[in-house]
UniProtKB/Swiss-Prot annotation:
Pfam families (UniProt xref): GLGE_C, GlgE_dom_N_S
Gene: glgE
GO terms for biological process, alphabetical: alpha-glucan biosynthetic process
UniProt superkingdom: Bacteria
Natural source organism: Corynebacterium glutamicum (strain ATCC 13032 / DSM 20300 / JCM 1318 / BCRC 11384 / CCUG 27702 / LMG 3730 / NBRC 12168 / NCIMB 10025 / NRRL B-2784 / 534)
Record-stated family: Belongs to the glycosyl hydrolase 13 family. GlgE subfamily.
Source lineage: Bacteria, Bacillati, Actinomycetota, Actinomycetes, Mycobacteriales
Stated name of the protein: Alpha-1,4-glucan:maltose-1-phosphate maltosyltransferase
One Gene Ontology molecular-function label: hydrolase activity, hydrolyzing O-glycosyl compounds
EC numbers, comma separated: 2.4.99.16
Keywords: Carbohydrate metabolism, Glycosyltransferase, Transferase
Amino acid sequence: MTGRLGIDDVRPRILDGNPAKAVVGEIVPVSAIVWREGHDAIAATLNVSGPEDSSVAAEPIQIHMRPTPDNQDQSNAFFVPDVPGNWTFRVDAWSDPMATWRHAITTKIEAGQGSDELYNDFEHGAQLFERAAENLSKEDRTALFDVASSLRRGGDVRARLAPALTASVTHLLELNPLRELVTMGENLQVRVERRAALVNSWYELFPRSTGGWDESGTPVHGTFATTAQALERVAKMGFDTVYFPPIHPIGEVNRKGRNNTLTPEPHDVGSPWAIGSKDGGHDATHPRLGTIEDFQALLARARELNLEVALDLALQAAPDHPWAQEHREFFTVLADGTIAYAENPPKKYQDIYPINFDNDAPKIYEEVYRVVKFWVDLGVTTFRVDNPHTKPANFWQWLISAIHKSNPEVIFLAEAFTRPARLYGLAKIGFSQSYTYFTWKVTKEELTEFATEIARMADISRPNLFVNTPDILHASLQHGGRAMFAIRAALAATMSPVWGVYSGYELFEHEAVKPGSEEYLDSEKYELRPRDFEGALERGDSLEDYIALLNQIRRANPALQQLRNIHFHEADNDQIIAYSKVDALTGNTVLIVVNLDPRSAREATVRLDLGALGLEAGAQFEVRDAITGSRYLWSETNFVRLEPLRDVAHIFVLPELPASRRERLAWREIKTYRA
């Protein structure tokens, strides 16, 4: 917007009016283009106010914005919200007469002008300092009056000017600027969520697969009680959230058999996503898992282990779901009177009825809200939403807003493998996190482009980097050997503050149902899959310890707990990728170097952008590998060799940056001006 002074391209700003995203304790960088006519100096102030229970609720704080050294028109600042809720910020531009005067008189003195020629300049400066002294404390007022007196004294011009240029006076004026032609910007919103919306590690497991085997070696159906026992291992690996696929009754009509066959055996358990039977629907638990009370006991055990339970919200129904019997209007009824089942040609899902949200929207909205609120009231605060991009956007916007009115702590993860317009559209209307195409990004070029993009979109979307899912076993894992599992885990755990693992990954499960498919052989979606995690660990056939170490490193390094700041460094081998993250609040800096080749040792010369690390040109510094504990002396140019059978990655922790070198690292890196 342009008033007396120009204020353009304020960021973060979501163009359709939705709030930007942030979490408690996160740096929120704010930038703006401020400009004016002529040569007079211009400055900007960031005004921030928070919700009622924040530290800045009663009176907004004002933060002086600083220009980017190589782009004087861009002003920068940041704030750190301390409570969840809706925060408001505004950028004001103002003419800075003091800076204009300082620049002018300094230039004239350097040009050799004397006392007589500078009479008006000194008098103007004295008057500015007298104006600036108004409303200050007695001590500060006296300091500025002394400067004015010095400017009016005769004698050497440099000596007269010197008191006006001291660090203490400069700092005092920065805290209490003399502002003219103040132009107020637009109030913009930031939706601040609890920290788990950004910093989180997820582990997915099927509760029904936690029952082990009977004496004959036959899998036993798990319960909420056996799941509670399984949580101890999950917590030991350092995960924050354990996610369960649907725990509801499973339809018996058109039930799928093993490996998605249409001819199930009597003992086949079906797909958990075919929700609903005579035993209940979305507000019931599968009878073989246990009762609602048993589920509450599981929640209590999870809390004891500092784990959060995420439930699957899949808005679809099996043919024998109560909705299909009592609310046929929720679905699409065909000409022959049957209800349409789900299709994604040529695939057919005869065991699932998709909901038609245009048939009876008010009742559907009311029923889904009732179901979600039922689980929230039991203590569930996170939902992984199945295929939200196949449901209307306005429904999700309404539902998330309605739940947040009473329970703002609830997190919604969008399982939306879809086009950017849909993925980012869902994020803008309220989803806290989103699945991504990380699984399919395998080359150095693809990974660099992907990580740069997710950092750039941090105001809108928070990516959850799952290394695998029950639906996705990427070819790189099928054929890359054990080293590839470690490589992908290291990348996911360090590229985003949110990452996830589906059970079995730590056992290097890699067999596909057929060549060219990404479906697991003997998929857990259709059968019980108990696993001998303890035996695998004893045999050395497990990635558990490595995953636990990654989560430990993430917790210990704030740089890995933020999304916005990632910088790639040059490595002269297309199989070696190097990138860094810096936390501007603590000065914590982490440099990650990964060998993308799971079969061969790779060497590279890594050339660091020292400025991106907050370091001076020519700096030498010690780095500590958080994986091995080894220490090295590094500089701008460094040799790296990584062997898959030993170490697939370095995660180097650099010396803590001093406060004086941190601030600029929090600023937005804007390469193009957005009009």
